[in-house]
């Protein structure tokens, strides 16, 4: 699995916490300390705070340097991303298969979502020139019975106040095909052996801007799927694995049955041999009597 890269949206700075209040016993104990001891403690606390500020300053500097390196390598990766997209275009249903095989994304997909995603031909993730300012995810679709758009996009950025924000393409749904307004229904797909209430449509993600700073689906696509989608496309189908397991069990049972038959046959042959031996002994006894 590809390593997760640092999010382009900068983390909020943590304010230093004040030292915990002293309990009654500690207060009374410290009250008995010489003033010199109190002064040394206060000076130590102030020095610790100064050192911590230096550590925080270096951490911020490191983050800036990491972002610069990431920006440099983003440019170097672009030709390879383009070549990969051209090759992926030769594989039918690559992206819908990748999404269905991803455990977090598949949990968001209903039956009709999967049908719509069969028309998805390309996915592109673009990180902005100033990485800290955000990124955009573009979904390219063939002509389909659900909506008019050829491209659906969602963008994550920092607004004027510096807070995470997002915006997206307005989906132009065809008459009666708005998947975000469908009623909840029960799904039973024998091919994937699941029966549960339909999840909220995947496409509601394009209209949900409630918490852009913690958009799990956007982060999963950008940091987990986009760096190496092939690893999820090649995940073996669980139903196939279960089917193979059942076939193996059947084969084992058949082999055990054949072994039992062979053992019974050997026992029968042994009994017949014993009967033949007894018959021969009887004939010999009769001959001796004569």
From Swiss-Prot:
Localisation per UniProt entry: Cytoplasm, Cytosol; Endoplasmic reticulum; Nucleus, Nucleoplasm
Segments of skewed composition (Acidic residues): 237-290
Region spans: Disordered: 1-45, 158-207, 236-290
Modified residues (N6-acetyllysine): 68, 150, 172
Biased composition (Basic and acidic residues): 35-45, 169-181
InterPro entries (UniProt xref): NAP-like_sf (IPR037231), NAP_family (IPR002164)
Keywords: Acetylation, Chaperone, Chromosomal rearrangement, Cytoplasm, Disease variant, DNA-binding, Endoplasmic reticulum, Host-virus interaction, Intellectual disability, Isopeptide bond, Methylation, Nucleus, Phosphoprotein, Proto-oncogene, Ubl conjugation
PTM annotation (Phosphoserine): residues: 7, 28, 63
Annotated segments matching region Earmuff domain: 79-225
GO annotation, cellular component aspect: chromatin; cytoplasm; cytosol; endoplasmic reticulum; lipid droplet; nucleoplasm; nucleus; perinuclear region of cytoplasm
Glycyl lysine isopeptide (Lys-Gly) (interchain with G-Cter in ubiquitin) crosslink location in chain: 154
Site description Breakpoint for translocation to form SET-CAN oncogene, residues in chain: 283-284
Modified residues (N,N,N-trimethylalanine): 2
Keyword Ubl conjugation: yes
GO MF entries: chromatin binding; DNA binding; histone binding; protein phosphatase inhibitor activity; protein phosphatase regulator activity
Free-text description of this protein's post-translational modifications in UniProt: Some glutamate residues are glycylated by TTLL8. This modification occurs exclusively on glutamate residues and results in a glycine chain on the gamma-carboxyl group. N-terminus of isoform 1 is methylated by METTL11A/NTM1. Mainly trimethylated.
Span list, region Dimerization: 31-78
PANTHER family associated with the record: TESTIS-SPECIFIC Y-ENCODED PROTEIN (PTHR11875)
Function of the protein: Multitasking protein, involved in apoptosis, transcription, nucleosome assembly and histone chaperoning. Isoform 2 anti-apoptotic activity is mediated by inhibition of the GZMA-activated DNase, NME1. In the course of cytotoxic T-lymphocyte (CTL)-induced apoptosis, GZMA cleaves SET, disrupting its binding to NME1 and releasing NME1 inhibition. Isoform 1 and isoform 2 are potent inhibitors of protein phosphatase 2A.
Recorded family membership: Belongs to the nucleosome assembly protein (NAP) family.
Associated disorder: A chromosomal aberration involving SET is found in some cases of acute undifferentiated leukemia (AUL). Translocation t(6;9)(q21;q34.1) with NUP214/CAN.
Assembly information from the UniProt record: Headphone-shaped homodimer. Isoforms 1 and 2 interact directly with each other and with ANP32A within the tripartite INHAT (inhibitor of acetyltransferases) complex. Isoform 1 and isoform 2 interact also with histones. Isoform 2 is a component of the SET complex, composed of at least ANP32A, APEX1, HMGB2, NME1, SET and TREX1, but not NME2 or TREX2. Within this complex, directly interacts with ANP32A, NME1, HMGB2 and TREX1; the interaction with ANP32A is enhanced after cleavage. Interacts with APBB1, CHTOP, SETBP1, SGO1.
Official protein name in the record: Protein SET
UniProt source species: Homo sapiens (Human)
This protein's encoding gene: SET
